[in-house]
């Protein structure tokens, strides 16, 4: 359930939350076109995914594989012993899947689908010169003023997320980049920054550039007089590579990355890729991550289609901890190619001409478009929210994220919230306390100096009436006396970020 969180107080009776990836054509990979539930979709031509029915059947299943000349390449013990099975030479994927599904010891089998990549005021030069419009838009380069995240206002509240690990499951990262190296997560065993599912090793070097760009948007080193500023200063970036130099990869390798992230303390996983074909194996892996409180951020896709009508996975998966993000422009419109969905997409975030770190060199930067970039902005925002509220549940944080939008007419029928992410609203929730004076309720609001807040009252927690909007003074605190409170014993009050 998507709920709204607010700072509440009750009067006593006396007073009282892209470049994208899609299933499709792949370069340099062995492919098979599979006919069936995923008709026309590309899959690995020599590999399938098989789920054993129970522990007792695994030995019999292994014998069945051997008898057909197949080999189990990989097993995921924490995902019900899901198997990655290498087929016999010349064996077709469709036939192998169909045959496995007839075995009494198999719960289900599916192809190994292909995914493809899509494409404080810090002193960082590209922030200061206005190139990073997504963080601070004052109308530069044809934009509309304030069609941004309100990042500087959010950073007034919290700017760093040094306790939070964000896993980027993508094409890897250029680990030596001047704006990224300091913020990379390091494995306590060997000091490496993550995992490479393509090699099985721990060197997730980016040969494509997609992952490096996402990394900079999420958590480029800020205030270092270089390059760009990330949304979450000092967040730790865990790099999990499953896409190759052409931006192509397989479900099995994505699952390996998810399992690595889950096993090594990731708080947030960025999923800037997707497909039109449902994978039960991938869904189970994401559900397992969610069950441990990990927040999942998925790009809505770049097909200019309605995800309510044509689902796009993993963004369309019905997971409580998953937020689906569409791409907005510098004028607060939907980016032409961004997917949308009144019920299946949660919110918009900047995804056009997003400037960030590039994999071409240690001081390289570039601009990219897509819901991938939009998702990265949300991952950074969630890192700051998790840092700020370590005791909050994942459901509470995502409810707050979904509430923290600027409502815009362009998004009213395009996503669940009808708005674009506002970082300041996600972070700037004031404390509220109640007192009394001469028989009337006094509401004390403690926020950030110079920020505006709205105090509202309700008798039923459903219908709220705004009492006053005020800008917090230098000490951040102000007091409101409700002269009407004597007529409403049991009245509730709340304070929220103002306009």
Where are these regions (language model features)?
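N-terminal secretory signal peptides that target proteins for export/translocation
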Residues: 1-20
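Inhibitory N-terminal propeptides of secreted protease zymogens
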Residues: 38-123, 131, 153, 162, ...
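Active-site core segment of subtilase-fold serine proteases
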Residues: 122-238, 242-249, 253-268, 287, ...
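C-terminal subdomain of the subtilisin-like protease fold in secreted/lumenal serine endopeptidases
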Residues: 239, 256-285, 292-294, 321-324, ...
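Short, composition-biased motifs enriched in small/polar/acidic residues
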Residues: 428-499
